[in-house]
Amino acid sequence: MYERQNYRLMFWRDGVISYRRFFSVNGLAGIRQEDPLIFEHTHRTLRQLIAEDLIDGVRVDHPDGLADPFTYLNRLRDLIGEDRWLVAEKILGVTEPLDPRLAVDGTTGYDALRELDGIFVSREAEDSMSMLSLQQSGSTWDEAAIAAAEHTLKRDVAQSELAAEIRRLTRAIRRDNFSTAGADVSDEDLERTVIDLVAAMPVYRADYISLSRQTSTIVADMVRRFPSRRAALDLISAAFLANGEAKTRFAQVCGAVMAKGVEDTLFYRACRLVALQEVGGAPGRFGVSAAEFHLLQQERAMLWPHAMTTLTTHDTKRSEDTRARIIEITERHKDFVELAQQVSALVPAPDDATAHFLLQNVIGVWPVDGGTTDAVRDRLQDYAVKAVREAGVHTSWFDNDTHFEKAVTDWVDALIEGPASSMIDDFVREIHRGAVQVSLGRKMLQLIGPGIPDTYQGQEFVDLSLVDPDNRRFVDYVNRAQALDQFKESALSGRIHGELLQARDAATAEGHPGLYPHLEEIADRAKQAVVHEGVYLRRQHPDVFLSGDYQAVFAVGEAASHLIGMARGVSGLDVIALATRRPLLLEDRGGWGETTVTLPEGRWTDRLTGKAFEGTVAVREVLDLLPTALLVADHVEV
């Protein structure tokens, strides 16, 4: 029976797999969507859903894995029509533009996630966090270190997990070379040069027209630095000029190597500030300045107003609220240095770099009340095993070191049960109130900013989750629905301001610290209110957000840098969103002081509190009860 089959079973590590895989997953074979017949067969269900008018849009996962993303997306656009939403999970580099010729409304929003997270990072902590990382892991994980590690890990992935794909590519290069270039290049030299070229590519895929010079620039640089590779590079270039299989496979392999080497490996090794190690992230760049943030939002409003923006997805390595907690480490970086050193002394780890990476994630999901239940313990231990396998230093998915993995889970258990537990409790309580403020403000900016915001399941409440399967846990929608009904009732009856004032006074009387002592108690309701009001406003006035202008809003005064604001509108300004940056440092300086913000002409009402303002107002008055505000001009009907 076996002899009569048109295939032969092979060991995957021999590097002779003859079918295209989804990255390195042997059980997922790539389908040739470039074949019109296959496209028709695989899109029958989608065509039926479109015919029955059951869906409003389509999200395309990993288009960089396709042979021809342009043609595929054009066909898909023809299938679903011009009026339906079409977004692509295209992971962009920091300076990489989305090709405007693609038949999509934009990306799925990981580029926006980097911006929305980065604006809340306290950049003053960079040196301190770098030195701590150097002490704990042997690397500062700054931009240069990240770049070096990225190149090394991409080479490793190309030589191991994706060796079969590299060998298929080199064979295609030989076939597509119709010149005499590189005729004397050995297979070994060609393969080594291909690996180095793939590792040097700074983007997932460089055959988009907007990146047309990327490959030639890298090739020219390699010729200059490695003269001995000239013949091999001539051979590769000649093959690419044929516009055949080699060029296509090179583009596909680059994306797979980038994903496996960076997202799935490097981002589980680097440990300076793990909140920045997200899909589409740039952890070597320590945060985003206000100037960069505003310019990027304006660009999105002009070029991609219908792109998705996101903070949490099924693929993010941490939920938005977990990342907010970790981001707040930067506001208490000196305390964190002390905590990390104490934990290292009290609870020796099987590996210091692993421990430093895991400690930040532990802080991210540690219960603020210190109630580390068995469920929390299980979640953290499961995450730790997944993280060390992804990192691939001491164990991996293919070569499990059960002794090391047991040592890591025992270390997590010792954190929970041992003397370090109370220290983590204290630190988490200190940064949590800042994290909630970041969560609320960042959500507000996402909802009011350019693009179409996506709210992942359950994220309208504060949710402290890690990577899958942790972010696929049960969501209590009944509780959320009941809370939303209560909010609507309070809003309709005009009780919101009074209820917030009462909650603040009660929390102050109980001795809770901070500018918003009541925020921890009402965190879920506050975040849900932000989501509800933002989405409601977008639904009532889609033109303001889908085609409206974007303007930055700036404060004036000693605490001006702590305010990040934006205004949206059509033929004028209609909506203003304000959020608090670096809230704990603001608290340290005693609050907003005499800092002011000047509103456009007319009366502006905060949808969250019901308070109204005009002209130049003190920020402390606008953000009296909540660290974020959604101001709507009186001429806007709501």
Model-assigned labels for residue ranges:
Residues M1-V16, R20-L54, D68-H151, D156-A163, ...:
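Carbohydrate-interacting/catalytic domains
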Residues G57-V60:
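Short catalytic-loop micro-motif centered on adjacent basic/acidic residues
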